Amino acid sequence: MSSVAPVRREVVVSTTAERAFRIFTDGIDRWWPREHHIGQSPLQREVLEPGVGGRWFGVSQDGTTCDVGKVLVWEPPHRLVLAWQITSEWKYDADFVTEVEVTFTPEGPKTTRVVVEHRDLHRYGLAAPEYRKAIDSPTGGWGYILGHFAKIAAE
């Protein structure tokens, strides 16, 4: 299973790399799809704490928190690497890690290419092909999620 290809999606947004990075991180609650939440109660707020070691979690309407992962690399405004600690059963596991790398590359004075790569999918074992299919889905995977980000970045 070590040959499971990463999922890679990208979008070009009409803003600076600095602003794109800020919207992706500090502004995650403005664009993260509400249905992308593994908590028992609906998602009220999505949080990405700045800096290496910062938590990535959702706050449910009932007040409970639901971890997604943590910040592994924080290099504003060009690069962010997050630990995605969601198992194939869509549950948080502190001992399970795949990586999501996000890069912000200027393509002009106010144009930035944002690339998301979700890798280490072989760690899902036999569930890897199905999990990869889910996070690569045009109706719910990383492309869909980046579409939400792009709408906010265009404002």
Located regions from the model:
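Hydrophobic ligand-binding cavity/cleft-lining segments
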Residues: M1-L43
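Intrinsic-disorder/low-complexity, polar/charged segments enriched in Ser/Thr/Lys/Arg/Asp/Glu/Gln
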Residues: V4-V12, R55, C66, R79, ...
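Hydrophobic pocket/interface hotspot
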Residues: A20-F24, W56, V71, L82, ...
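Short beta-edge strand/loop motif at the mouth of beta-sheet-based domains
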Residues: G27-V68
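Tryptophan-centric aromatic hotspots in well-structured domains and transmembrane helices
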Residues: W31-W32, W74, W84, L121, ...
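Short, highly charged C-terminal tails/helix-capping segments
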Residues: Q40, A150-E155
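Hydrophobic-ligand binding "helix-grip"
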Residues: E46-V47, Q61-T111
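Beta-strand/loop substructures that line and gate deep hydrophobic ligand-binding cavities in soluble
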Residues: E89-G140
